[in-house]
Swiss-Prot record:
Required cofactor(s): pyridoxal 5'-phosphate
MF annotations from Gene Ontology: glycine hydroxymethyltransferase activity; pyridoxal phosphate binding
Compartment annotation: Cytoplasm
Job description of the protein: Catalyzes the reversible interconversion of serine and glycine with tetrahydrofolate (THF) serving as the one-carbon carrier. This reaction serves as the major source of one-carbon groups required for the biosynthesis of purines, thymidylate, methionine, and other important biomolecules. Also exhibits THF-independent aldolase activity toward beta-hydroxyamino acids, producing glycine and aldehydes, via a retro-aldol mechanism.
Gene coding for it: glyA
Gene3D superfamilies linked: Aspartate Aminotransferase, domain 1 (3.90.1150.10), Type I PLP-dependent aspartate aminotransferase-like (Major domain) (3.40.640.10)
CDD domains, A to Z: SHMT
UniProt name for this protein: Serine hydroxymethyltransferase
Feature type site, description Plays an important role in substrate specificity: H229
Subunit annotation: Homodimer.
GO cellular component entries: cytosol
Record keyword Cytoplasm present: yes
Length: 417
């Protein structure tokens, strides 16, 4: 028998307890600008840390291979219904363990090994699972990649030309480092011209889509996948969505289970349900509107400070910065900013001469700082401090002065009260 006091983490494993405490301290003392990170609510974390962790539930609600699933069925049913309501669709699979798992399931459902897939190049802002040669999507399938035009927008002419030439079975519209707006209708027209399945990967913008502040893909795409963290502020996990296509929905069900997963993570599914409930509140729309305002506020300052922004600016929550003119690499800038209590990630830019481990760019975003309560004023300050460091990487005085200012700002805006 366990005791919550005797068998607490602190009493059982002080090394892990201390590591977690250090991470809690880091999250409080650092400004989080990684575009794919956010802060989950106490309610989400409470659900994820619940005794649902203990329950095996292979299958789907109402059709399990184990007994004793009547209560976890409630959690999964709520998660599905809330996801459907949030995105206005009639099918949602809440079982994928991650966005990559959701993408893999879609591949398995609609393609055969060797089929051609057209997706955004990783160097242009795509994702590993969109056909990168180092990923399953580029190894099992014949991957063709599109990029950006000279203005930093998706090169739709190239997409159409590649589709006509290679006749892909599936086209992927989505990104991990693109700051523009996707024209879903153009992608639909191109997909229809070659009879391809159109998949949207909305992992980065799902919260914006749900709030109605980013174009809705569902009138145009056959299927959409997303993560449940990032702009949705839920637990780390995946989600598959589609509308008015029961035949495809049936394929997605079996592609997840028994296709690529066994038992679902019921504690995570419960946490997803909580996050979807939070996202259905009117305050979530206000939050997403502020996410966009804060990204634009940083864009304005960074342009004034002479930092080039790929695509010329941002129309969503993220910015991809070309820091070539600073004389420093993305790797150097990421480390310097870390010492100054600003967390970012180095990122390749289009036609980057440096390796992905070094890069010439940085990717930043506004979701986490907006959750923290930052408004435009604070975001302008952060952007100026970021520029100070990026132009002076390795300058101990600049880094220390910046860190002190960031600590003061963080104390005024705690992550959790």
């Amino acid at each position: 028998m366990f005791s919550f006091e005797k068998n607490s983490l602190k009493n059982t494993d002080k090394e892990i307890f201390d590591a977690i405490e250090l991470e809690v301290k880091r999250q409080h003392e650092h400004v989080e600008l990684i575009a794919s990170e956010n802060y989950a609510s106490p309610a989400v974390m409470e659900a994820q840390g619940s005794q649902l962790t203990n329950k095996y539930a292979e299958g789907y609600h109402g059709k399990r291979y184990y007994g004793g699933c009547e209560f976890v069925d409630i959690a999964e049913k709520l998660a599905i219904e809330r996801a459907q309501q949030l995105f206005g669709v009639d099918y949602a699979n809440v079982q994928p363990h991650s966005g990559s798992q959701a993408n893999a399931a879609v591949y398995n459902a609609v393609l055969k090994p060797g089929d051609t897939v057209l997706g955004m190049d990783l160097g242009a802002g795509g994702h590993l699972t969109h056909g990168s040669k180092v990923n399953f999507s580029g190894k099992i399938y014949n991957s063709i990649q599109y990029g950006l035009d000279e203005n930093g927008d998706i090169d739709y002419e190239q997409v159409a030309q590649l589709a006509k030439e290679h006749k892909p079975k599936m086209i992927i519209a989505g990104f991990s480092a693109f700051s523009g707006i996707i024209n879903w209708q153009k992608f639909r027209e191109i997909a229809d011209s070659v009879d391809a399945v159109l998949m949207a990967d909305i992992a980065h913008v799902a919260g914006l889509v749900a709030a109605g502040v980013y174009p809705n893909p569902f009138p145009y795409v056959d299927v959409a996948t997303t993560t449940t963290h990032k702009t949705l502020r839920g637990p780390r996990g995946g989600l598959i969505l589609c509308n008015n296509n029961p035949e495809l929905a049936k394929k997605f069900q079996s592609a997840i289970f028994p296709g690529i997963q066994g038992g679902p993570l019921m504690h995570v599914i419960a946490a997803k349900a909580v996050a979807f409930k939070e996202a259905l509140e009117p305050s979530f729309v206000d939050y997403q509107k502020q996410v966009l305002k804060n990204a634009k506020a940083m864009e304005k300052v960074l342009k004034q400070r002479g930092i080039n922004i790929i695509s010329g600016g941002t129309s969503n929550h993220l910015l991809l910065l070309d820091i070539t003119n600073t004389g420093f690499s993305g790797k150097e800038a990421e480390a310097a900013l870390g010492r100054a209590n600003i967390t970012v990630n180095k990122n390749s830019i289009p036609n980057d001469p440096r390796s992905p481990f070094v890069t010439s760019g940085l990717r930043i975003g506004s979701p986490a700082i907006t959750t923290r309560g930052f408004k435009e004023k604070e975001c302008e300050l952060v952007a100026n401090l970021l520029a100070d460091v990026v132009f002076n990487c390795g300058d101990e005085k600049v880094e220390n002065e910046t860190a002190a200012k960031i600590l003061d700002l963080c104390d005024k805006f705690p992550v959790y009260k």
